[in-house]
Amino acid sequence: MTQVTICGGGNLGHALAGWLAARKGLRVNVLLSGQERVSHWETGIAHQNGIMVIAPEETRCGRPELVTADPAKAVRGTRIILLALPAFLHQATLAKVAPFVDTGALVGAIPAHGGFQWSAERAFKGMATKPVIFGFRKSPWTCRVVTYGHSVRITGVRTSMEVSAEPTATVHETAEEISHLFDIALAPLPHFLHVTLSIGNQILHPGILYGRLRDWDGIPFAEAPLAYQGLSDVAAGILHNLSDESQAIGEAVVLKLPRLHLSPIRSLAEEMRTSAQALIEDASTLQTIIGTNRGLFGLRIPSMQVQGGWIPDSKSRYLAEDVPFGLCVLRGIAEIAGVTTPWIDEVLNWAQMQLGACYLRDGTMSGPDVKRSGAPQAFGLSTLSQLMHR
């Protein structure tokens, strides 16, 4: 019997708990952040003897063995620990579970952007425990909670995935072991920087908000603005520029660290086209890829209702996660690799003003809030050699 512990009770946490608990040979624990959440889960599970997972091809109901807010109870004896959490919760969660992790256990994040490998290194530094750290490049599912602690719906399923691991010599056996959990082919990546440098939400969300709101006059909107539909030429151009600079960062790392055998970094358009091909009506440009993706129809910029209408929520994950644990990571690597990024700088300067934070100061990643980000500078990393080695 293999014990798996899931850290997190959001959309992905629900899906993992129900899906994996329904599999034979797995004992599934769930670690939540407080007793109130535990009580909600226990009530929902008791109602139908598990967490209901409604997927396109089938419905499963799996009952976790244990739902708890106690990291010791959740983690002791666990073979595989899965963090299904926003990147800004990785460091705190790793610090809580680290004292109870067995040597040789697998500790990973889904997905593992935002400097996860550096957070894990910090959490286990100086400990006798030496786990294998792994990370998915993407999430295996698109999912949404139907009823908290009770049911979740999977709306999209990936047929293949990529995973990285440290020590790097363990990546093939790690990929093979993890693939059995999901019945999905897992391609091993030769280094964690493949995951860290992958283009996605870290430029999409801040770029969308900057393109939509940089000239906003502060007057509330009648309704929360659409995030993706009706994207202007200017906003699409900003995203294209951010994508180009992100690729340039990857190319510089590939050139300067040839031993890593990093694959070329795909553009934002290529990433979105690949991940949602069946949903896109017109894949000719980045603007049409975003605007005709049926999976994005109707999605709005996270907003708050105020007197007179709606205003954008600067505390939403579009900024609160994708800037410190997304854009800052790219900008930090760019600084180390010697790549200039005028568009990333422009968007980052605007975004940090919305957040009331300072990461980029006088053109360098030296602001006081860098220490609360996933940028390599937050971990004392200042050379490409340090990025390469755990």
Where are these regions (language model features)?
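NAD(P)+-binding Rossmann beta1-loop-alpha1 motif at the extreme N-terminus of oxidoreductases
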Residues: M1-I54
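Conserved active-site and cofactor/substrate-binding residues in soluble primary-metabolism enzymes
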Residues: C7, A15, G115, A169, ...
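Short beta-strand/turn micro-motifs composed of small residues
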Residues: G8, L32, L85, P111, ...
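Rossmann-like NAD(P)-binding element
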Residues: E58-G104, G108
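Rossmann-like NAD(P)(H) cofactor-binding subdomain of soluble oxidoreductases
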Residues: A87-H150
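Substrate/ligand-engaging "lid" and interaction regions
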Residues: P140-E251, S373-H389
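C-terminal substrate-binding/catalytic lobe of Rossmann-fold NAD(P)-dependent dehydrogenases
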Residues: A185, L193-C328, A337
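Long, positively charged, glycine-interspersed low-complexity recognition regions
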Residues: I289-R390
